[in-house]
Amino acid sequence: LAPIVYNLMIILGGLLMTDQGDPSAEGFAWGVLAGAILGNFLIQAVGAFREGLRFPSGVPLSSPVLREYLLLALPLMLGQSLVVLDESFARVFGTQLGEGPTSQLGFARQTMLVPIGVVAQAAGVAAYPYLSRLVEEGKLREMTTSLARALRYVIVASLVATAALIALSVPTIRALFERGQFGPADTAAAASALVFYAIGIPFWGVQQLLARGFYARRQMWTPVLVGTAATVLAVPIYIILKELLDIRGIALASTVSIAGYTIALAVIWIDRTGTHVLAGLGQTMGRALIPAVVAGGAAWLVAHAVQDLAAGFTGAVLQVATGGLAAAAVFLGLAGWMGTMKAVSDD
């Protein structure tokens, strides 16, 4: 629940301040604070205390438990992963194109992160304790099977999100951000960046789960070192694609970089554990890709069919709502007919 609550509070903060006539980023900032307190602290604290967590009177520095924790956490503290620095790259390279592109990239990236938070981060957070317990019990085969199943679910959901965001990129950005000085031209630019960002959603989803798999096996250094290397290699990719495609190139560089990072993690995982973690992934992607593409096409057609019924914010919300419902209905129907969900659940 933590990433879902965190992202929802950010969105809610922005909407509340906008309704009060303040189009600045202050509402999003308050949403970050509220989401961090409610999602990342209070929910976790309540759950931990229900499970019997109690604060000891004192923890000596020589405690083996404390030493083990520090050794496990050290790689995460020292590493500069692409996942952490991707936002900074967008801001740094975006400023080279001017103030407008920086905001456009930021809004497009925020929109892309919503389905990642709802699907991938939530799945990763939920799966990690279970995967860790299986490793501690020596059930490595069962752990790998569970991870593979979770990956299949995330891939299916990510493909649907990608198709829907690409099809509804313009009305989505318009509904969320087009007000004040952020006009139609900014919406078009941000929507074009969102298309390239959205292509990377499946890779973000797989990365979130694969990283948890390494963490569950206490191989903390692997995703950190690979992520740090990916960060270094990402810099020339950003430079080249920015020169070629401007704002869209920066978004595409993000997708290319996270794709390379994810593929590298997958190759290392296969080398260490065998190919079972990827069991059925190809079949699942094959059965999910066609329904997702058709669903995206349906969303685009419906959104364009209703675009003249209302203008401005109301019209954009209408397009997103009707297009989203059309995408969901078409995908569920076509996926059921093609046996997509059966391929996901089969081990």
How would you describe each model-predicted region?
Residues 1-16, 199, 206-239, 248-251:
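Alpha-helical transmembrane segments of multi-pass membrane transporters/permeases
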Residues 2-15, 22-49, 229-233, 247-268:
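Hydrophobic alpha-helical transmembrane segments
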Residues 25, 44-83, 271-286:
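Interhelical loop/hinge segments that connect adjacent transmembrane helices in multipass membrane
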Residues 25, 30, 67-72, 94-114, ...:
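Interfacial/gating helices of multi-pass transporter permease domains
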Residues 70, 106, 127, 139-168, ...:
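Interfacial transmembrane-helix starts/ends
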Residues 121-139, 148, 211:
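Helix-loop junctions and terminal segments of transmembrane helices
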Residues 166-200, 313-314:
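Interfacial segments at transmembrane-helix termini and the short loops linking adjacent helices
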Residues 301-347:
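Membrane-proximal transmembrane or re-entrant/amphipathic helices at the cytosolic face
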